Amino acid sequence: MSKETFQRNKPHINIGTIGHVDHGKTTLTAAITRALSAEGLANFCDYSSIDNTPEEKARGITINASHVEYETPNRHYAHVDCPGHADYVKNMITGAAQMDGAILVVSATDGAMPQTKEHILLARQVGVPYIVVFLNKIDMISQEDAELVDLVEMELSELLEEKGYKGCPIIRGSALKALEGDASYVEKIRELMQAVDDNIPTPEREIDKPFLMPIEDVFSISGRGTVVTGRIERGVVKVGDKVQIVGLRDTRESIVTGVEMFRKELPEGQAGENVGLLLRGIGKNDVERGMVICQPNSVKSHTQFKGAVYILQKEEGGRHKPFFTGYRPQFFFRTTDVTGIVNLPEGTEMVMPGDNVEIDVQLISPVALEEGMRFAIREGGRTIGAGTISKIIA
């Protein structure tokens, strides 16, 4: 049987379900595939096939996450659903599945619960830009309790707005009833997907952003100069472009005099491609792995930031003991690792394996950093945690 080719005829969006345990995230994921399969836009995935999730690895951390794909008339979606709370935390922090938006599932009978709040905060810290709310289990609410649902909606809107998510649409429904095929509730799933289509914009393609390439290696070609190689993270680079070399030392400027891929010369290199760039006036000792080459003034190097981090448990190959303020592990960004000194937030004595916490980090060398960027924390050659930069300080 031949493999189907991926048809790139609709914009592609990555989304995920988030929310408190047992509020119906996986049931909703199954209900979406059921509702859309009726229109030939998805293959129906039942609850057990989603719940029986494969493991994936991101930055050395094992995450249980299930990926389902489906389409609406306008778009193609990849949807991630995780079974355990810790898996959500790890998935969001490591960016194993980068989300362009999320569906927050809240049970109408419970309202916002601790993990609801934690997932909203995490979504904000790791840069999930948009949220659509599905108020689930509405079939369990009696007529006389109907106004309680209005209160739950108000509380949710306030909670979301507090974290910077203003005006999120809230769709009421029942994932279980929709999964069972109840027509009026299936309609609510269609309404939800319409809200997702309308309220989660198609992200800017990486190719339209300012050029950036982390340097992986440096070569000297006699008579031609210095070549740096790496995978272009975003944007486009052309022969003749002015570029900056940022990180580890003072920022320098240069001009790209050649772009090569697989030993062939190209007029330009684009996001996702592995290329070699020939740089004018730069010696082999002026550049090193871990610096980045970028469009001038698009990125700066920094030494201090706040990060939302998840620290691995012992069973996940992490530390066996807690750490305290003053801890000095390696922080791994793109192609470089730099020692950093950790400061814990006020009122936090120590961080235990398995915790997720916001820390303040002072790096011993400057690195090209941006908010929303992912990093790994390593000690003695093994990953002990992962994080996302939530704020740059200096």
Swiss-Prot record:
In terms of one coarse class, where is the protein primarily found?
cytoplasm
* UniProt keyword Hydrolase, yes or no: yes
Ranges where the record places region G3: 81-84
Region (G5) residue ranges read 174-176
Q: Locate the region G4.
A: 136-139
Q: Which InterPro entries match?
A: EF-Tu_GTP-bd, EF-Tu_GTPase, EFTu-like_2, EFTU_2, G_TR_CS, P-loop_NTPase, Small_GTP-bd, T_Tr_GTP-bd_dom
One GO molecular function term of this record is: GTPase activity
Going by the UniProt record, its keywords in alphabetical order are:
Cytoplasm, Elongation factor, GTP-binding, Hydrolase, Magnesium, Metal-binding, Nucleotide-binding, Protein biosynthesis
- Which reaction(s) does the protein catalyse, per the Swiss-Prot or TrEMBL entry? GTP + H2O = GDP + phosphate + H(+)
Question: Which parts of the sequence bind Mg(2+)?
Answer: 26
Enzyme superclass (EC)? hydrolase
Q: Where is this region: G2?
A: 60-64
Q: Which CDD domains would you find in this protein's record?
A: EF_Tu, EFTU_II, EFTU_III
Provide the protein's localization.
Cytoplasm
Query: Which is one Gene Ontology cellular component term of this protein?
Result: cytosol
The record places domain tr-type G at 10-204
Q: Which residues bind GTP?
A: 19-26, 81-85, 136-139
Query: Which parts of the sequence are annotated with region: G1?
Result: 19-26
Listed PROSITE patterns: G_TR_1, G_TR_2
Listed under subunit, the entry gives:
Monomer.
HAMAP family the record matches: EF_Tu_B (MF_00118_B)
Q: Which family does it belong to?
A: Belongs to the TRAFAC class translation factor GTPase superfamily. Classic translation factor GTPase family. EF-Tu/EF-1A subfamily.
Protein's job: GTP hydrolase that promotes the GTP-dependent binding of aminoacyl-tRNA to the A-site of ribosomes during protein biosynthesis.
User: Could you tell me what this protein is called?
Assistant: Elongation factor Tu
> What is the native source organism of this protein?
Chlamydia felis (strain Fe/C-56)
Q: What is the lineage of its organism?
A: Bacteria, Pseudomonadati, Chlamydiota, Chlamydiia, Chlamydiales
> What would be the name of the gene that encodes this protein?
tuf
